Regions:
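Small-residue (G/S/T/A) turn/hinge positions that recur once per unit in extracellular repeat modules
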Residues: 49-50, 99-103
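Bacterial N-terminal signal peptides that target proteins for export
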Residues: 2-17
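Short, aromatic- and glycine-rich surface loops/edge beta-strands on solvent-exposed regions
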Residues: 119-132
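Short S/T/G/P-enriched beta-strand
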Residues: 29-66, 74, 138-158
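Beta-strand-rich structural segments
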Residues: 63-78, 218-222
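Extracellular/luminal low-complexity segments enriched in Ser/Thr/Pro
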Residues: 103-118
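Short flexible loop/turn segments that cap and initiate beta-strands
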Residues: 72-100, 231, 249-251
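Glycine-centered low-complexity coil/loop motifs and glycine-rich tracts
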Residues: 146-214, 227-314, 318-349
Length: 349
């Protein structure tokens, strides 16, 4: 390949990289449309519309799920929304009206973590195209509870220690004064001054200890039915209560109360370098060079903090829950084993 083609290829590569960078940084829709990477729906003659959830028709509390909308035009060509659908249709050209679930500007649905907000309801979305009242897609979204839920009430991690300050470099010694080497008038050059020592680096600070995991209390009641559900409320001092609905046939709830990790010790500062000795002055004889100063010692690294202690977990459950206790799991490592208390528990909401 001759030099001319090499230069041309470089220009093309640089231009393509610059365009890609501009699109990545600005997300410029106009550029994407100009390049044919996106299409405005108003420029198409579409006849059908359909909505779907590629990750499955149902959602669990706390889950997100991308929405995909598909169109067919008069020629039979299929057009799909951007994002999860990897298509060209812009979400900004559509109106998505959600119920129970929420939706963001990229067509991603979300069901609230708190099951009380969706209890006894199904999610619903309606997709319409402004200016085209004949195009409408509706989608019902059942709520599922047969998934692994988890809640962590762990202690806070310790703070990291401060790094030590670096030592100061020593100053260089002064050069010796000049003598002379003239016949009958020789004089010795002066000795160079010694460099000063570098100072020691500061010690790193110790890392803070991790916080203890709090004592956790779990209340569990049974909601009877053709497919029984476990109502659970998990609480800890100073923490917001967490609510769960769990289908024990496939679902589970894991409760964690571990101590926070200790913070890392700070690094010791580097010792300062000794100053160089000054040069001996010229003369007959020349002066001696000064001695270089000693380097300072590096500071000691700080000690890591200790991990916090793991919290206790107490599970209070209604007698009707006992056959389903295998769906309740705990993790508090070396802390005492969870305490189980069987006593009547009324419906929790």
């Amino acid at each position: 390949m001759n030099e001319r083609w090499v230069q041309l290829w470089r220009r093309i590569s640089i231009g393509a990289w610059g365009l890609a960078a501009a699109m990545g940084l600005t997300g410029c829709t106009a550029i994407k449309v100009k390049l044919g990477m996106r299409v405005h729906l108003i420029n198409l003659t579409v006849t059908t519309i359909a909505a779907s959830l590629p990750n499955g028709p149902a959602m669990a509390p706390g889950e997100t799920s991308p929405l995909v909308v598909t169109f067919t035009d008069t020629s039979g060509k299929v057009w799909v929304t951007e994002g999860e659908g990897n298509g060209k249709i812009l979400w900004s050209d559509l109106t998505v009206t959600p119920s129970v679930v929420t939706v963001n500007k990229k067509g991603v649905l979300r069901l609230a973590h708190d099951p009380r907000k969706s209890d006894g309801q199904a999610g619903h979305v309606e997709v319409t195209v402004p200016g085209h009242p004949d195009l409408k897609a509706a989608l019902d979204i059942p709520v599922r509870y047969d998934v692994p839920f988890a809640v962590s009430f762990n202690g806070a991690n310790g703070s990291s220690g401060m790094d030590g300050m670096s030592g100061t470099d020593g100053t260089s010694g002064l050069s010796g004064s000049s003598g002379s080497c003239v016949p009958d008038h020789n004089s010795a050059g002066g000795d160079g001054g010694n460099g000063s020592d570098g100072t020691d680096g500061g010690n790193g600070g110790d890392g803070g200890n991790g916080g203890d995991g709090p004592p956790v209390r779990v209340l569990i009641a049974l909601r009877p039915g053709a497919r029984p559900l476990l109502q659970a409320v998990v609480s800890a001092p100073g923490r917001k209560d967490r609510h769960f609905l769990v289908d024990p046939q496939g679902g589970s709830l894991t409760i964690t109360s571990n101590g926070g990790a200790g913070g890392s010790g700070g690094r010791g500062g580097k010792g300062g370098r000794g100053g160089s000795g000054g040069s001996g002055g010229f003369g007959c004889p020349s002066g001696s060079n000064g001695r270089s100063g000693s380097d300072g010692h590096d500071g000691r690294s700080g000690s890591d903090g200790y991990s916090g202690r793991n919290g206790t977990i107490t599970i209070v459950y209604d007698p009707a829950v006992k056959p389903y206790l295998a769906a309740i799991k705990t993790s508090n490592k070396s802390a005492p084993a969870p305490v189980y208390q069987e006593t009547p528990v009324a419906p929790l909401w």
